[in-house]
Amino acid sequence: MSEPPVIGVLPLTPARFPDLATLFEEGGDPKWCWCTYFRSRGRDWSNSTAAGNRAELKALAKRDLAPGLVAYRDDRAVGWVSLAPREDYERLATSKILAPLDDVPVWSIVCFVVSRRSRRQGVAATLLDAAIEYAREHGATTLEAYPVEVPKGERIPAANAYHGTLTMFERAGFTVVERRQWNATSPVHPIVRLDL
């Protein structure tokens, strides 16, 4: 039986950080990463710890511009999306696949986390809609993301879908602006944009 729909999506603040911590501590990559991977460069990331990553995200929650949005159902955090102006994500500047396409000032969506009990219930799509509105309200003119393309009829592990799926972004009005890959044998990664 599925859970009721998400009832609210709110910016991360220090007061909401314990709710997000409960979600992230369910396990998997969020428990270690704390959604800081794209905010650091290689060497800094290699030297990071789960406690340090948690402290970094907690500090980011104190900013006027939230580092992401939290989805709630019945006062429980069930989802997260990380979004910010692209320059906040240091790793994007040095990535071969995700390097800037041009000089357009974009905001980037880099990560989704959805509670195990709430997956396949529209939580990520609800977060995406809220992210579009949040970016628009804060002056963004273009939103960019780096989703995974799932072949029709196939499923992928949740751990591989943390960027969101291409179909979800296309349903929200995003279009593929480029496809990149490391080399001829690596997977192709779409880059999508939405003009706000």
Predicted features along the sequence, with ranges:
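A short helix-loop-beta-strand connector motif used in the catalytic cores of GNAT acetyltransferases and
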Residues: W45, A50-V70, E87-R91, S108, ...
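Conserved acyl-donor/pantetheine-binding loop and adjacent beta-alpha core of acyl/acetyltransferases
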Residues: R63, Y72, R76-V113, R117-R119, ...
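C-terminal "cap" of GNAT-fold acetyltransferases
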Residues: N160-A172, E178-L196
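Conserved GNAT acetyl-CoA-binding A-motif
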Residues: L128, A135-N160
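Conserved GNAT-fold acetyl-CoA-binding loop/helix
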Residues: D29-A55
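Short, well-ordered beta-strand micro-motif
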Residues: V70-Y72, S82, I191-D195
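Conserved acetyl-CoA-binding loop-helix of GNAT-fold acetyltransferases
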Residues: I109-V114, R120-E137
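Conserved N-terminal entry element of GNAT/NAT acetyltransferase domains
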Residues: M1-R39
